Amino acid sequence: MTNMRKNHPLMKIINHSFIDLPTPSNISTWWNFGSLLGLCLGIQIITGLFLAMHYTSDTLTAFSSVTHICRDVNYGWIIRYLHANGASMFFICLFLHVGRGIYYGSYTYSETWNIGILLLFAVMATAFMGYVLPWGQMSFWGATVITNLLSAIPYIGTDLVQWIWGGFSVDKATLTRFFAFHFILPFIIAALVMVHLLFLHETGSNNPTGIIPDADKIPFHPYYTIKDALGFLLLISLLLTLVLFSPDLLGDPDNYTPANPLNTPPHIKPEWYFLFAYAILRSIPNKLGGVLALILSIAILAIMPLLHTSKQRSMMFRPISQTLFWILVADLLTLTWIGGQPVEHPFTIIGQLASFLYFFLILVLMPACSLIENKLLKW
């Protein structure tokens, strides 16, 4: 009898991707975050689908419909908070996944890396539009401020903003289209994930040493399915702890006030996972310059393969590069803190210095340091 797992057209794809996949024997827990991101996406799509059954994308009833979900729908409160805090978990896993890619030189698989950057942009766009849907104060003003940035584009800026708004301000048309895009984008993300995995399986996974591991590979199942299952358990435990004990910890109290175009909140700020980019945006006095810096803060990842000057792939055996990497991490945490602070002294100057350091580290210091390490190792 033929083995169905290896011969059936559909099962064969699953088998080659998750069961008989040759995997490096030494990949660490840092390689768990890809599967955890898949879990997060699954949680977000399922909880989002149930929320969409009860949500109404109308400016008059959106806020009330979210309240109705929490108060009247069976287990609506847990679905809503799983979705809201699931987004935070998604971004924690994303940042760790990208950080691992930078540290271990995974960006040298340029196709996989570039699809990953597209995924990052798509997830950020989805999260931004999702934040607008409850139609609280921060939803409305966040949407107004961020969409208004497009007006900085010369000549077509104002027309572009009004086209996105569907009128002369953020209103019913904006909310309806944001809901439509927020619903469809996760499925586009799921398709991009398939492409991401397709390119990854063309080359095989990287590993902590950065050395080609063809001589020492093991099947994905059962070794890494068990390892991923432990990650799933920890992630779900963390998410449920957050949802059941402190569901509003990462949210903004202003979003419990219905949107009011006549009353501006004292500090307009996005969700915590956008604060680093928001700090970079605010640190440049010129509007167009700020918008460009905001886009470049993520797009800069695309030129990382070009900036790789080291003869070694991974940072595992490069202590100077490791130091710079952890300075970059500290810098991003500083930017996240600054993004949540008011625009006043000393936060302004700290934000400007941290923004400069972010680009200087990636564009100048890290490539220069790699060249120095090559000399020290006589490579």
Swiss-Prot record:
Q: Does the keyword Nucleus apply?
A: no
Membrane-crossing ranges are 33-53, 77-98, 113-133, 178-198, 226-246, 288-308, 320-340, 347-367
Q: The organism sits in which domain of life?
A: Eukaryota
Where is heme b b566 annotated to bind?
97, 196
Q: Where does a ubiquinone bind?
A: 201
Question: For this UniProt entry, what is the primary localization, expressed as one broad class?
Answer: mitochondrion
Additional comments on file? Heme 1 (or BL or b562) is low-potential and absorbs at about 562 nm, and heme 2 (or BH or b566) is high-potential and absorbs at about 566 nm.
Please explain the role this protein plays, according to its UniProt record.
Component of the ubiquinol-cytochrome c reductase complex (complex III or cytochrome b-c1 complex) that is part of the mitochondrial respiratory chain. The b-c1 complex mediates electron transfer from ubiquinol to cytochrome c. Contributes to the generation of a proton gradient across the mitochondrial membrane that is then used for ATP synthesis.
Subunit and interaction comment? The cytochrome bc1 complex contains 11 subunits: 3 respiratory subunits (MT-CYB, CYC1 and UQCRFS1), 2 core proteins (UQCRC1 and UQCRC2) and 6 low-molecular weight proteins (UQCRH/QCR6, UQCRB/QCR7, UQCRQ/QCR8, UQCR10/QCR9, UQCR11/QCR10 and a cleavage product of UQCRFS1). This cytochrome bc1 complex then forms a dimer.
The name of this protein is Cytochrome b
Query: From which organism does this entry originate?
Result: Ochotona collaris (Collared pika)
Gene it is expressed from = MT-CYB
